Amino acid sequence: MKTITLLTLLLTASAVVAADKPVHLFILSGQSNMQGMDPRTGFMPEAKKLFGDEEVVYIKVAKGGQPICRWLEEWGAIAKEKGLDEKRIKRIHKDGKVEFYQPILDQYKEMLEKHPKFASVTFCWMQGERDANGGGQPAYKDALKLLIAKLRRDLERPDMNIVIGRLSDAGQKKESWGAMRKIQMEIVNEDPRGAWVDVDDLNNREKDGKVINAVHYNRPEGYITLGQRFARQGYALIKGEKPAEDGRP
């Protein structure tokens, strides 16, 4: 009887400790470079090292080649307001559905069933290539700011941190590409809970004897480093520390 009682007490104590352990949620979303990042190889090992005994969990909603309008139903109205013509709007939108916003809410709800209270929520965003190539950059700043605001509202986390992966240097010959990089930095700098990740060193590779800056990052090391940087910048925001200003923590 004493053995059973002792075992019960130990199990109860373990459950209490587990319940008291802070849980930090990261939302990983975006297009191909976020899709290509396996959180198990770079992000989670780094997060576990940083947070120690605290628990880190994540949800991931990402798919290659997707413009921001796949996350935001208000994008069409924003695009018109910013002067995009109907032809360009149709070319970017392609009558596609807003298919990636609700899955974030659904996965968040599922996570809440396992962890009723998150110590922090951090939104990691790696997207923008499709909008830059399609000429959608005039609407991008307002669209991304609204997406962030909606997530903070719908997740009931006005304290949600954001970490934006700035577009790489792959397409800098295009004016729209450079404009997109600038927009992403403006959003980070204007948000008191914002940080950014630099990826300009993750896509350099040799082709036909020349070094090129590719759209997609080097495998596996580029995506491992990407995950580590997201974890480090998120950790700094969560702990009230100053994120790396150069985006390369």
Question: What are the functions of these language-model segments?
Answer:
Residues M1-I4:
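Positively charged n-region of N-terminal signal peptides that target proteins for export
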Residues L9-A18:
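Hydrophobic h-region of N-terminal signal peptides that target proteins for export
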Residues A19-P249:
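Cell-envelope and extracellular/periplasmic
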